[in-house]
Design a protein with these regions (language model features):
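Aromatic- and carboxylate-enriched substrate-binding clefts and catalytic-loop regions
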Residues: 64-73, 81-84, 242-379
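Carbohydrate-recognition beta-sandwich/jelly-roll modules
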Residues: 1-245, 250, 267-269, 285-288
């Protein structure tokens, strides 16, 4: 490459090839020499042409619960969550698909760890553009990036989904609901449940972006465990059927505070004793009980906070912010998270709290973190 008259040794190779047996088309981007420039994003291969305003021309995106966008869709596609990073709420599965009537393709990113997509659809169309991009891992492109295209004749979005399912099965990563239930029988208990989302304690730190100094009553809230127990009994008596209670803010620090040092149960709300009564009530009624927990947001206010366990960038800095209720925070390196999970759930078990489930925010929603601390380097 030559940049502003200076030659740099940065080099990469691109390959496009067809597997004869399957007729799948592979696009590969391979870094050869990463000296001279720092690559931020690679947009390759380019977007497919889908330019006509036709209702049966459409695009499939794995955004949140899934999106199907006809080319004449009246609504503009605005910002995609997490900038379309694969394996986040913006792209839960690493593929997208487009159809012109009954003919189309599915593009599967087989190296999704530092990759995502971008898409554009203006109000009323007449087109939808979607393409893949690759980003560095700890400052380097580092490894081969691959997208596999499969052409589909006389098919639709169902065929695209089946092709991805077959791909995942071929990789040994498919796990159906039946297989999950065979491993954890309580998965079947979720069938027919109504989901109830409730909280116990909210406490907003004064330095938090959420803190409202003009309306202090909005910052903090407390509901005793006994109140939640009473509500669950009443719903049961009214014939609500099987319930799953997801409980936020059940611990002493309050919702989104002092993670990963979250126990004990909120004393003001009745402590372990009343939390156990709530859990026992749910079990007696044939309902399910689960908690919200967190092992990513790493709060400065946590007693065990140690900057050495926070995610570190390649320049040595540690990202911080104060967006959530708990105030100033960094991100806990995920290599360390299992130790805190074991510690906290052992404490819950010691206090005889029966849990049917737990939601560990935000591993299945946010982009994966990387950490350049040599003691626990993580890509």
């Amino acid at each position: 490459f030559e940049i502003e008259g200076t030659k740099v040794p940065y080099a990469f190779e691109t390959y496009a090839w067809i597997e004869e047996t399957t007729e799948d088309i592979f696009f590969e981007w391979v870094p050869i020499c990463e000296e001279g420039i720092t690559v931020e994003k690679v947009f390759w291969p380019g977007e497919m042409e889908l330019e006509e305003k036709k209702n049966d021309w459409y695009t499939l995106l794995n955004m949140q619960q899934g999106v199907l966008i006809p080319n004449d869709w009246e609504t503009e596609l605005t910002a995609i969550p997490f900038d379309g990073f694969f394996e986040t709420a913006g792209g839960y599965m690493p593929w997208f698909s487009q159809f012109k009537g009954r003919n189309g393709y599915i593009a599967i990113c087989t190296t999704p760890w530092n990759a995502g997509y971008q898409a554009e659809h203006p109000e009323n169309g007449p087109y939808t553009h979607v393409g893949v991009r690759f980003e560095p891992s700890l400052g380097r492109m580092d490894y081969k990036r691959v997208v596999r295209y499969t052409l589909i004749e006389d098919g639709d979005y169902n065929d695209a989904c089946k092709i991805y399912r077959d791909y995942v099965r071929e990789q040994g990563n498919l796990c159906t609901l039946n297989e999950k239930a065979a491993r954890v029988a309580s998965v079947d208990d979720l069938i027919g449940c109504s989901f109830i989302h409730k909280g116990i304690k909210t406490f907003v730190q004064p330095e938090s972006d959420f803190f409202d100094p003009e309306n202090p009553d909005k910052n903090n809230n407390l509901t005793p465990f006994a109140v939640r127990t009473k509500e669950m009994k009443e719903l049961h008596e009214l014939g609500a059927g099987k319930l799953y209670l997801h409980l936020d803010g059940w611990a002493e620090p309050g919702y989104d505070n002092k993670h990963p040092d979250y126990t004990p149960a909120c004393e003001e709300a009745g402590g372990w004793k009343d939390m156990k009564e709530l859990a026992d009530t749910m079990q007696k009624q044939g309902d399910l009980f689960g908690i919200h927990d967190q092992y990513r947001d790493y709060y400065f206010a946590a007693e065990s906070f140690d900057e050495d366990y926070a995610c570190r960038l390649t320049d040595g800095t540690i990202p911080t912010h104060k967006r959530w209720a708990g105030g100033q925070q960094s991100y806990l390196c995920a290599t360390q998270a299992p130790h805190y999970v074991k510690r906290n759930f052992r404490e819950i078990e010691k206090n005889q709290i029966h849990l049917d489930g737990a939601y560990l925010d935000v591993f299945t929603c946010n982009e994966g973190d990387e950490c350049n601390n040599p003691r626990h380097r993580m890509t």
